[in-house]
């Protein structure tokens, strides 16, 4: 069975991307800053969801705070992509009674615990990227970083 997918608009320098923390609380701010530096060096504008630095136990805020952050970024008409800050645990809890607002689709980028969010988008036919979260991006080899941006900016992937 083949699912028809809608691809969000390809990104370009000057686009606004949001940092969202849907899973574990941020623990390594240095790694996050390095990831942000990569996005900024490519000309992207960065916004931070309201609760991205919150902490509730091991999570990046309560379920409601994290859900509001996700909704804030998804609903912002100027936002072109959501950069998940890190994985861990807790994203699937946000999907209980969750409905994606019907807006122009945006890229959601992450892996690990974020996979549930990516699958929920796939179920409604929106493509996303199972790729580095913000706190792991700088530790990816250059070829991996290049492939991420080749896809997000041009929709092209060269064979490995």
Regions found by a protein language model. Name each.
Residues 1-78:
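ATP/NTP phosphate-donor binding region
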Residues 59-60, 93-98:
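Metal-dependent catalytic neighborhoods of phosphoester/phosphodiester hydrolases
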Residues 126-160:
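Conserved anion/nucleotide-ligand pocket segment
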Residues 28, 90-92, 117-118:
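Short, well-ordered alpha-helical microsegments
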Residues 94-95, 120-123, 140-143:
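Short acidic, glycine/serine/threonine-rich loops at helix termini
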Residues 98-120, 127-134:
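Short, acidic/small-residue loops that bind anionic groups at enzyme active sites
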Residues 81-92, 111:
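N-terminal glycine-rich "phosphate-gripper" loop used for MgATP/nucleotide binding
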Residues 42, 73-75, 94, 120, ...:
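Hydrophobic structural segments
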